[in-house]
Amino acid sequence: MKNIREIAKEKILILDGAMGTEIQKYNLTEDDFRGERFRDVPGMMKGNNDMLNITRPDVISDIYRRYLEAGADIITANTFSCQRISQADYHLEDCAREMAFEGARLARIECDKFSTPDKPRFVAGDVGPTNKTCSMSPDVSNPAAREITYDELFTDVSEQVDGLIEGGADVILIETIFDTLNCKAMIDAAITMMKKHGVELPIMISLTVSDLAGRTLSGQTVDAFLASLSPYPIFSVGMNCAFGAPQMKPFIEHLAKVAPYYISAHPNAGLPNEMGQYDETAESMAPQIAEFIDEGIVNIIGGCCGTSPEFIAHYARSAEGKKPHQVVEKPKYMWLSGLDLLQVDDSVHLPVDASRFVNVGERCNVAGSRKFLRLINEKSYEEAIGIARKQVADGAAVVDVNMDDGLLDAKAEMVNFLNMIAAEPEIAKVPVMIDSSKWEVILAGLKCCQGKCIVNSISLKEGEEVFLSHARDVMRYGAAVVVMCFDEVGQATTYERRIEIAERAYRLLVDKLGMNPLDIIFDPNVLAIATGMEEHDNYAVEFIRATEWIHRNLPGAHVSGGVSNLSFSFRGNTYIREAIHCVFLHHAQKVGMDFGIVNAKARMDYNKIPKDQLELIEDVVLNRRKGAADDLIELAAEIKAKADAAKAAAKAGGAPAPKPAAPEWRKQPVEERLKYALQKGITEFLQPDIDEALQKYPHAVNVIEGPLMDGMNLVGELFGRGEMFLPQVVKTARTMKAAVSILQPHIEAEKQGGSTTAGKILMATVKGDVHDIGKNIVCVVMSCNNYDIIDLGVMVPAEQIVKKAIEEKVDAVGLSGLITPSLEEMVRTAKEMQKAGLRIPIMVGGATTSELHVALKIAPVYDGPVIWVKDASLNAGICARFLNETECPKFVAELNERYERLRNEYHEQQAKIASLEEARKNKLDLF
């Protein structure tokens, strides 16, 4: 019987559809979910679909069977949330592996019943993303914090995959990925468990993007996501959830053009309507899916939320006899990534005469920057982050980070700094180079990066065994690597030794380990020249010769170097040092040097160096004549003397140093400056701008209600249009919090010591729903806008919400829900609040919620204000209107008027639909 890899080349494979949608059709009770075994477990079990593998295996097997009858080639095991971290919400952590095993075992039994030599059926062990993220902080005041670590997720998913493999999975499907670091940990766990069991199962990856701009929730573009996964042995890449077929199609088309894997798509049954239901039918979806098939952009097609066996039957018929997508070739260029893709090809360069060159920013290195070391020692992280930000602004395409100092905890500082810059989109967009001589520091850093970063470095210094072990780690964590030309004998200083070590390392990495040569960056050792020792004079020449040899003889490999080492003899003379670097890079880049650890801002233009100086510097760098180094030392002394004299004259004359020109946005009125600062997350000028605003506005709170809220509303609009993504919104929220903290003493003074919070808000994900990422984002944004947040977490019963709201005397309640059953629970919560005599505002949000549902179902059962909030960035502004005594009545009246109009329009539309259905029933049959 053929395996799935062989079949994927010949035909389009049919994946099954939604599991949750089908389970709902059985109208299972709490007792069905619990069974006898879990009768006494605290909390609500209904909604924990994975436990049905144990308590109602008949239901799960029946669903598998119906999908197989519909023509599915691949059955997705009911194991989406079989991780300890997910089952903790139900107090069933210790059953997670058993659920995974049973889910796969039941699927195996049904697949084996339907398998034939002509149509074998396969079990996909399903690994969901969990409701935690490794890449983002749950605490706005501490961007370095993480709710879960790579190691914790790796451990949980390892246990899950262990159960899936033992249960009979043929494939591991890691799906609905919104954070690439989560995905990396899951791939790592899957590969580790396969090795344990002695099997090699295909790994299917399916991401979900958060908006039509095409970024994941954690901020990566689709291309950056592909780069992050490029070192791993992936079978297929695709997308699921979030969108219906038309919205998903452009992304699948792009994947089909650039991803060197089989392509999968399992879209929802359209987009949820206002009532949280899916309007698409199997018949209406069939032609949409047929486009994916007929255009040859997929190898695997199936369904997600809202789909059923009827949908899959239509898809199977559409795919019959159709040719699958032809997988594109692997990229010929190196892929690196932060939030964005960095493709190291002919377009990556700064100087016009370079073929390709990547500036690696050198200033975030405690060994190379005294200022950076001081800031890290003083825990002045905001200033240290500013150094990274400036390097990127100055042209660094990669940021090198090194924390190796005897007085620092290098591992802790590396993790802390990498986590902090991950929250800075203008830095996080570029890849990171993790630089350390301590391997445990490098490993810790690798577990912080969702992008594809660079390890700096490994070498043969400790022999082949250690070298290969380190290289395996690099591959395991999905990175590229710098290989130093250093072996057991020592550092290579001659051309011959450089190429000997480079070739040996290349063969070990490529031939023995199977590393992609594009992920190898050799550092042939940039060493100091013009030191006064004749044997050093040829170091630059031999580096350049070795670079050319590597470029010609080691296909795919790159060359880098720490450029500032070259001019070490001239420390203290910046001009000469930068001129030496410029000349060296000019010649090294011509023959294949494509990376360099440099100060990007200090790059000189080769063509603007005075001709006499250029000739002398080239004599030294290229070792063209004896005595050139002495002449350069003399020139350096002359230049330094002139510079010192100019400084002394300026000081004697009292002439102040010229100030840099202010950026254009600083010339705008204070309101516009504050809005811009919020949008871009700039805190540098908040104090003077707020001081100016306080002179203009009668009360400090007016600054919040005016320009600051205007800025937040603008961010909300941009986010809604897909022009900003989540990490940017979170950074905006932190900037808002900083602004409010500046205003707080003024508000206190005006209130004579009264409360300075904008209001107390209770937040909860309703009973039956364990999704809390959206709610957590709302909590972050609201707290940054000076609201006191009480977060009850997930799976919160209506009675608990009411009790806490009364106890805490909250000003408003926020209800969150991601799944369709949550809509009914929100109605019940509103009824319970009504019964308890509460009339405080209710804010409703989440993927399945809508304004129409609020108007039809929630507002009519509650006398207080109820509003649907489209996204997290809008909550603060809405709350401000509700809690403003002057604004609130007008706002509520507008809402009630709008709800009445929506209800009338809905009922009119339903009447038309009913009339049409009646007419169809009463049609005259003439034939």
Language-model segments: residues:
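Domain-level signal for soluble alpha/beta catalytic cores
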Residues: 1-927
